[in-house]
């Protein structure tokens, strides 16, 4: 039976740690850390994600600020909102909730965020810092994966790692973080020939393909650590009866892979909770540095 890499449990532990860091620095700083979220439009899923982030802020004693703009807002108004938050001394982290409505280009808007307040770690400067091994905000999902691997003392140095997916959001920074941990890293993508022959060599397999149930037992080396970044909602299956409603799944066919793997992240409850937690980590870290407080989160920003 594969070890369950429980992101929900680790996220709860890290929230307690962040709460303690905030409490320890509150008097000297004179204010709590603040996270500002810019939400555009009324996409229901985005609304749920934003609400979850605000609740997480509340649990650790972080202030949260929401700028909710209409779907047809001009790009200039979004830029003005971001610039205002860049100058706001209460704000340590800024998050532009994605995806954006049609007609808005996320590139210039993400670039407008102060790199020091880049809570998502997606600014070009911060991706460059990651590449060079310099300190700075880290991409949240890959950072969460690294924290999970570290929590379970999974060795990476000298291991063969394969990342499926090359997005700037997950795949590319994930590969850089694994490389920094001295793993030998390959990145697979939609043009990779004979994917299984590559993934069967992986001691650590990180799947961020964005395709439901894509990876099965034929892709996994016995004893491999498998990290499933994907999350998808499957429609209800009539053959399972009316009591079985829509289900969540990942990019991995977990029932097939679990008997082979030495460790596996569940979906839900694996990588997802850690993504939100790393957003908080980036924001608290900036607050500590900006307010001249002891920096107690260095181990989480690899």
Swiss-Prot record:
<feature type="binding site">
    <location>
        <begin position="165"/>
        <end position="167"/>
    </location>
    <ligand>
        <name>NADP(+)</name>
    </ligand>
</feature>
<dbReference type="GO" id="GO:0000105">
    <property type="term" value="P:L-histidine biosynthetic process"/>
</dbReference>
<dbReference type="GO" id="GO:0006164">
    <property type="term" value="P:purine nucleotide biosynthetic process"/>
</dbReference>
<dbReference type="InterPro" id="IPR020867">
    <property type="entry name" value="THF_DH/CycHdrlase_CS"/>
</dbReference>
<keyword id="KW-0028">Amino-acid biosynthesis</keyword>
<feature type="binding site">
    <location>
        <position position="231"/>
    </location>
    <ligand>
        <name>NADP(+)</name>
    </ligand>
</feature>
<dbReference type="GO" id="GO:0005829">
    <property type="term" value="C:cytosol"/>
</dbReference>
<dbReference type="Pfam" id="PF00763">
    <property type="entry name" value="THF_DHG_CYH"/>
</dbReference>
<dbReference type="GO" id="GO:0009086">
    <property type="term" value="P:methionine biosynthetic process"/>
</dbReference>
<dbReference type="Pfam" id="PF02882">
    <property type="entry name" value="THF_DHG_CYH_C"/>
</dbReference>
<keyword id="KW-0658">Purine biosynthesis</keyword>
<dbReference type="GO" id="GO:0004477">
    <property type="term" value="F:methenyltetrahydrofolate cyclohydrolase activity"/>
</dbReference>
<keyword id="KW-0521">NADP</keyword>
<dbReference type="InterPro" id="IPR020631">
    <property type="entry name" value="THF_DH/CycHdrlase_NAD-bd_dom"/>
</dbReference>
<keyword id="KW-0486">Methionine biosynthesis</keyword>
<feature type="binding site">
    <location>
        <position position="190"/>
    </location>
    <ligand>
        <name>NADP(+)</name>
    </ligand>
</feature>
<keyword id="KW-0554">One-carbon metabolism</keyword>
<keyword id="KW-0511">Multifunctional enzyme</keyword>
<dbReference type="GO" id="GO:0004488">
    <property type="term" value="F:methylenetetrahydrofolate dehydrogenase (NADP+) activity"/>
</dbReference>
<keyword id="KW-0560">Oxidoreductase</keyword>
<comment type="similarity">
    <text>Belongs to the tetrahydrofolate dehydrogenase/cyclohydrolase family.</text>
</comment>
<dbReference type="InterPro" id="IPR046346">
    <property type="entry name" value="Aminoacid_DH-like_N_sf"/>
</dbReference>
<dbReference type="InterPro" id="IPR020630">
    <property type="entry name" value="THF_DH/CycHdrlase_cat_dom"/>
</dbReference>
<comment type="subunit">
    <text>Homodimer.</text>
</comment>
<comment type="function">
    <text>Catalyzes the oxidation of 5,10-methylenetetrahydrofolate to 5,10-methenyltetrahydrofolate and then the hydrolysis of 5,10-methenyltetrahydrofolate to 10-formyltetrahydrofolate.</text>
</comment>
<dbReference type="GO" id="GO:0035999">
    <property type="term" value="P:tetrahydrofolate interconversion"/>
</dbReference>
<dbReference type="InterPro" id="IPR036291">
    <property type="entry name" value="NAD(P)-bd_dom_sf"/>
</dbReference>
<protein>
    <recommendedName>
        <fullName>Bifunctional protein FolD</fullName>
        <ecNumber>1.5.1.5</ecNumber>
        <ecNumber>3.5.4.9</ecNumber>
    </recommendedName>
</protein>
<keyword id="KW-0378">Hydrolase</keyword>
<dbReference type="InterPro" id="IPR000672">
    <property type="entry name" value="THF_DH/CycHdrlase"/>
</dbReference>
<keyword id="KW-0368">Histidine biosynthesis</keyword>
<comment type="pathway">
    <text>One-carbon metabolism; tetrahydrofolate interconversion.</text>
</comment>
């Amino acid at each position: 039976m594969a070890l369950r890499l429980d992101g929900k449990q680790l996220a709860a532990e890290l929230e307690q740690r962040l709460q303690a860091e905030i409490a320890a620095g509150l008097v000297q700083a004179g204010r709590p850390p603040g996270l500002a979220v810019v939400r555009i439009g009324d996409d229901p899923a985005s609304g749920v994600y934003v609400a979850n982030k605000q609740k997480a802020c509340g649990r650790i004693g972080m202030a949260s600020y929401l700028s909710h703009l209409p779907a047809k807002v001009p790009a200039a108004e979004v830029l003005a909102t971001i610039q205002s938050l860049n100058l706001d001394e209460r704000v340590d982290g800024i998050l532009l909730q994605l995806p954006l409505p049609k007609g808005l280009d996320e590139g210039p808007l993400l670039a407008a965020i102060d790199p020091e307040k880049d809570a998502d770690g997606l600014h070009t400067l911060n991706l460059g810092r990651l590449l060079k091994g310099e300190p700075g905000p880290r991409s949240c999902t890959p950072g969460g994966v690294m924290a999970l691997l570290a929590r379970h003392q999974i060795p990476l140095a000298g291991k063969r790692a394969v990342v499926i997916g090359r997005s700037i959001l997950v795949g590319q920074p994930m590969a850089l973080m694994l490389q920094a941990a001295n793993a030998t890293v390959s990145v697979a993508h939609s043009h990779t020939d004979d994917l299984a022959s590559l993934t069967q060599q992986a001691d650590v397999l990180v799947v961020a393909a964005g395709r439901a149930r894509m990876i099965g037992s034929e892709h996994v080396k016995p004893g491999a650590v498998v990290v499933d970044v994907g999350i998808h909602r499957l429609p209800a299956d009539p053959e399972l009866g009316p009591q079985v409603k829509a289900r969540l799944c990942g990019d991995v066919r977990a029932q097939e892979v679990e008997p082979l793997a030495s460790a596996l992240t569940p979906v839900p409850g694996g990588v997802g909770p850690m993504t939100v937690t790393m957003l908080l980590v980036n924001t608290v870290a900036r607050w500590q540095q900006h307010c001249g407080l002891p920096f107690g989160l260095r181990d989480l920003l690899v």
